[in-house]
């Protein structure tokens, strides 16, 4: 991200208010329309989804949380984890 002048990468763990088929489908539909979210995974554990977000700076990310993710009715809570350094990044599976 730094090389592309994109600031930094954030992994945002999202917990929905309630989880059922309709709410999950609506959430994923909304997320697919948000360009700042470059990856989205349905996960197990304390949270329901893991989002990968690119942000140019902290103020931008704060506004994104308040004005974009914060407007999603089904969103219950979130936790942001900021990437300090990318240690390894590969595509594909080596057999």
Which functions belong to the PLM regions below?
Residues 1-95:
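A compositional/biophysical signature of low hydrophobicity enriched in polar/charged and small residues
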């Amino acid at each position: 991200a730094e090389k592309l002048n994109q600031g930094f990468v954030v992994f945002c763990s999202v917990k929905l208010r309630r989880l059922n088929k309709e709410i999950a489908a609506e959430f994923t539909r909304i997320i697919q329309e948000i360009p700042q979210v470059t990856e989205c995974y349905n996960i197990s554990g304390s949270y329901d989804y893991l989002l990968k977000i690119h942000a140019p700076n902290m103020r931008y990310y704060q506004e994104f949380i308040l004005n974009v993710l914060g407007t999603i009715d089904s969103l219950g809570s979130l936790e942001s984890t900021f990437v300090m350094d990318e240690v390894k990044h590969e595509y594909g599976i080596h057999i």
